[in-house]
Design a protein with these regions (language model features):
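Inter-motif core of Ras-like GTPase G domains
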Residues: 1-15
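Cysteine-nucleophile active-site neighborhood
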Residues: 148-234, 240-245
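Short amphipathic alpha-helical segments and helix-helix/interface helices
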Residues: 2, 57-60, 116-117, 154, ...
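Short glycine-/small-residue-rich Rossmann-like dinucleotide-binding loops
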Residues: 143-147
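Short glycine-/polar-rich loops that comprise or flank the Walker A/P-loop
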Residues: 5-9, 36-38, 204
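C-terminal lobe/tail of nucleotide-utilizing enzymes
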Residues: 14, 21-128, 132-139, 193, ...
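A short helix->loop->beta-strand "cap" motif at the edges of active sites that frequently abuts
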Residues: 7, 66, 171-175
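Receiver (REC) domain switch-region micro-motif
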Residues: 9, 41, 142
């Protein structure tokens, strides 16, 4: 991407993993001529005495002819979303200690897993990423997330018997939520006539929703506005008809019992004035293509209060703004950068 854009590059290395200088040096050498785009280094997540690190900084600068323009200290609980799913690879991850247990099925090819970070700012939620049948079967809400390869993840989920665990959770009264690729998995069938995602042309879904999905050769990518239109009072009391914001990024189109939400696509294939149906609900399960739906504070609190009601707990007021929490976290990161990074160097390589 940097080569296509003709952009300068700063190489960032996390020192807490070990071997940071070897990693930086090796990357520059392996890139060959393209390595000339790398203008400097940032050392990230440093703990300890900077004077002890200085010989290493001098060494990498002398060996590659590029400066280290900053050493960022390790900042615990910065409050920003994880960069990728590496944090989920070491088995079960659980954060929070609330009364509402939410389990996200940790698919092998999970995507957009930060969709569920907003739950971490709620005082009554325990959020867990897991493939444990016991965790899934005893959750108050199970989320089937998006996937980079929906068909493969669906087949792997079935091979592990987690389809049975999800149904057990539903039969015990848990709410099942399916987002994007998870929404496609939750339907009756997935058709892949062009073999976009696999060599399997047709696969049975989980049968939780009355929809079928067909993969085409084009991808939907757009921001959306939405409102609940299908049985809103029964589906989610307290946010009837409220406007929601999010985005779509998926292959495939679904058909069937669709119309839980009415959406307007703000970019991509349709004009803002065009309203389209999205989402489906049946029994204790609902699903949608809308990523970022839980960043809508009133909607998120409404979902949680419905779960509290089922547990015999009083509702909580919606006093948490996820957007404001993210902005404060970004401000803290900006303060760290101003304090520990040569911003003047960055401006110079950008020609500012």
């Amino acid at each position: 991407a940097a080569k296509l854009a003709g952009a300068p590059v700063l190489l960032v290395g996390d020192i807490d993993k070990g071997g940071v200088f070897a990693s930086l040096y090796g990357t520059v050498k392996l890139l060959g001529r393209d390595g000339r785009r790398i203008k400097g280094y940032l050392i990230n997540k440093f703990r300890g005495d900077l004077d002890i690190l200085k010989p290493g900084l001098d060494m990498i600068e002398a060996a590659t002819g590029r400066p280290v323009i900053g050493v960022l200290p390790y900042a615990a609980d910065l409050g920003l979303p994880e960069e990728d799913s590496l944090s989920l690879r070491n088995g079960t991850m659980s954060r929070g200690d609330g009364t509402i247990r939410i389990v996200v099925v940790r698919l092998r090819y999970i995507s957009n897993f930060t969709d569920f970070d907003p739950f971490l700012c709620e005082p009554d939620v325990q959020l867990q990423y897991s493939v444990s049948p016991a965790d899934i079967e005893n959750a108050d809400m199970v989320i089937i997330p998006g996937s980079k390869n929906t068909v493969k993840d669906l087949l792997l989920l079935k091979d592990a018997g987690l389809d049975r665990s999800i149904r057990t959770a539903r039969d015990r009264g848990a709410r099942i939520v399916a987002i994007c690729g998870g929404y496609q998995m939750a339907g009756r069938k997935i058709y892949d006539p062009h073999f976009v995602e696999s060599t399997v042309g047709e696969v049975n879904g989980l049968g939780l929703l009355d929809i079928e999905t067909t993969f085409g050769e084009t991808k939907t990518t757009c921001q959306v506005e939405a409102k609940i239109v299908q049985r809103p009072a029964a589906f989610l009391p307290g946010v009837d008809g409220g406007e929601l914001k999010g985005y779509e990024i998926h292959m495939g189109e679904s058909r069937g019992d669709i119309g839980l939400f009415e959406i307007r696509r703000l970019s991509g294939q349709a004009l803002p004035s065009v309203s389209l149906p999205d989402g489906s609900a049946r029994d204790h399960c609902w699903g949608t293509y809308i990523h970022g739906i839980f960043e809508n504070d009133a909607f998120r609190r409404g979902v949680l209060n419905r779960l509290r009601e089922k547990k015999g707990l009083a509702p909580l007021p919606g006093s948490v703004s996820y957007t404001e929490m993210k902005e404060r976290a970004l401000d803290r990161l900006a303060d760290l950068l101003r304090l520990h990074v040569d911003i003047g160097f960055i401006r110079r390589i950008l020609g500012l």
